[in-house]
Amino acid sequence: MKFFARHYLVQITHPLIMTDEMEEIERFAKSTLGGMPEVIKLLGHHNVELAKEQFRENNEMYLGRKYVQKKTLALMAMSVSLSNGQESSAMIHFKLAQNFGAEMLEILDSIKVAKMVVMASTMSVMTAILPVVQKRNVKASDDVEINKILAKIQSESHMESLPEDLVSLASISFGLLDEHLKEKSELLSPFIMSQKDVFLIAFADAVSIRYPECAKVYLSQFFIKGGTEKEMEDALFLTRFITGNRTLTSATGILKW
């Protein structure tokens, strides 16, 4: 039997006979989310236990977190989805963020963060390729000038040491370093979102694309802005959920059969 529900929050319009467990899940979903998530509904048609597990994860790892507000969780989920190129998943969380009162400028802040983190991830190869570049005796700029800029970055960010990939980038291409700093200034300067939330979302994005050095930098900045370990834990739970959930959002076409 095919299903053609196209949105995350959908009304039941097909003649399925639901079990008591699925009816209980639906009632709870409507009271907390405003409707039944499509993927849980589809899973329940095939296997109730899988649907129950998905609903448990949705509640315990995502919208049931206690220390980051639901609006920020939804914006974070959207940003993580965008960082991983998951358009359909991003739309799901965009709509949830709207339901929780997110303004369009907050949506744009979250999109900007995702873009910054994904672009910054290209620096992950800089330390590896630096020896190859050095063999050619190519210098991007005067070492004194580079060191001045790096010292300023370290002072302004209050970091004990600069990321190795950033230092390598400066040696490989002064122009790319300058571009990175321009992007950082623009994309990590929010319209209305708090700077703390910007760094928490950036941390989640970096974790999701598996860029440890980037994640370390943004987590440090998050703590400097007053973030807590509990909020960090919420972000890690959410990132784990959204990362694994990609398999289900990609499988909705299969589950509709």
Where are the regions that the model predicts?
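Helix N-cap / loop-to-helix initiation motif
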Residues: V68-K71, G101-E106, M193-S194, G226-K230
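Hydrophobic/aromatic-rich structural module bridging two neighboring secondary-structure elements via a short loop
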Residues: H93-V117
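Short alpha-helical scaffolding segments that buttress acidic/His motifs in well-ordered protein cores
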Residues: Q54, N58, L75-V80, S110-V117, ...
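C-terminal binding/interaction regions
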Residues: K112-M116, V125, D143-K148, G227-K230, ...
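Structured core of small recognition/catalytic domains
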Residues: S189-T228, F241
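Acidic, glycine/proline-rich low-complexity segments that act as flexible tails and inter-domain linkers
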Residues: F3-K70, T122-D197, L219-I224, T247-W257
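"Short basic amphipathic alpha-helical interaction patches in structured regions
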Residues: A90-Q98, T127-A128, V217-S220
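Short, thiol/selenol-centered motifs that function as redox-active sites or metal-ligating centers
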Residues: M76-I92, S121, I201-V217
